[in-house]
Amino acid sequence: MSDTMKEYIAEAEKDLLHTYNRYQIVLDKGDGVYLYDIDGKKYLDFVAGIAVFALGYQNKAYNDALKAQIDKVIHTSNYYYNVPAIEAARKIKKVSGMDRVFFTNSGAEAVEGAIKAARKYAYLKDGCTDHEIIAMNHSFHGRTMGALSVTGNPKYREAFQPMIGHIKFADLNNFQSVLDQVTDKTCAIIMETVQLSLIHISEPTRLALIS
């Protein structure tokens, strides 16, 4: 490790909030499936921004589209329509088979939106405020309070109690354990098809049963 990299890491440790255990490298650029640190060392990137950047680095179509949009407008808020959002929603509907699209900034925000949508739908149906959500043990859904509440790993939750209420947990790929938690108060079941924190993959037959 070069002295320059050591200096950057020391500065980061002093200035950045310690929310993650970071690897002792300072990244500089990417190309295809590879990343390079400031010393020029090459890494095969299996992380992809934690599964959010599957296109790789220096993807020409992506870069060209991004540069073209920057020259027009970067952000307008949801109070207005814009062409890229409309076109993206059309394409997402086509491949997903869903009726509507809701754009968010992060996975945690998407989970928060899903929790709110499920609870609001159930509330509008019967006026009750004690509906339950079933989540999976060993899951990870994000670091916001709602997402933490449906995260099935105590080590992420313990310092932030109390969580939001009426959350129950079952085991992935154990249909009976899910069924045991279902009551007339259940308004949603939240699960990952692949639990990255445990590398646990949902079996298609059990996923179909829950669906």
Question: What label would you give each PLM region?
Answer:
Residues 199-211:
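Single conserved hydrophobic/aromatic residue that forms the stacking wall/gate
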